[in-house]
């Protein structure tokens, strides 16, 4: 039987890893030879979840076309966020909760996207639809993804469906969602040992916005000041990254998981897009964004609309 690879976006977060594992597990239960793989390194938060529920991290793959002819995408659809050789394979399925952009196929594809806060919320439904019981360790990872994407149910992306799914998954996993969730978020928020390269790559995603090429990374922390102490080093490396990738704008969104506010470090020839989008003026390349915690719902849409107006 031909193998199918299941993977999420580059610079994987907890939802990407958990969704790949959970969906590959479901496909195997349904008789498909599926393997969850990853396109980048696992972050501290995700590793905490993997260790807690005793699940091995997926295998790292740099060229998916050397491994399989057919792939399934989870937690993303935009080609620039996917495998470098994504055009050399056939995408057969997509399970996602983001905007649909820069995505097309030559053949019909099973595409399931829902306006919920996390991909594993959708997968929880799919397990039920197929009558497959979720293993406790898989449920734990799926819960971890919801906690991560919703910042423990505080993000504006969080829906009632996410909360209900989290409660169900916590029961299966045998944990208290709030107690476990806070421990996991704190583990991921320790940025003290991160290198500059690791910081600017944290959950980094590339977007096409109007005529512009934009990259947005997000770092969750309990102390934004600690990160900003390294601003000079960050800016030097970001400027090099902008030149290397020919970016019009780079944003590092540093989010305080305790106050639910963010500080955005913005650089690039189109950095003023962020100022116009939020109606704020940057000071020393920094913008203070009160109440902003979600890149998907509070940053990408307003930036996309502002960029579109430039055309």
Curated annotation (Swiss-Prot):
Gene3D superfamilies (alphabetical): DHHA2 domain (3.10.310.20), inorganic pyrophosphatase (n-terminal core) (3.90.1640.10)
SMART domains: DHHA2
Disulfide bonds: none
Single GO MF descriptor: inorganic diphosphate phosphatase activity
Catalytic activity: diphosphate + H2O = 2 phosphate + H(+)
Cofactor(s) named in the record: Mn(2+)
Listed EC numbers: 3.6.1.1
Binding-site residues, Mn(2+) 1: 9, 13, 75
Top-rank EC class of the record's enzyme: hydrolase
Cellular localisation: Cytoplasm
NCBIfam families: PRK05427.1
Family label: Belongs to the PPase class C family.
Name the UniProt record assigns to this protein: Probable manganese-dependent inorganic pyrophosphatase
Gene: ppaC
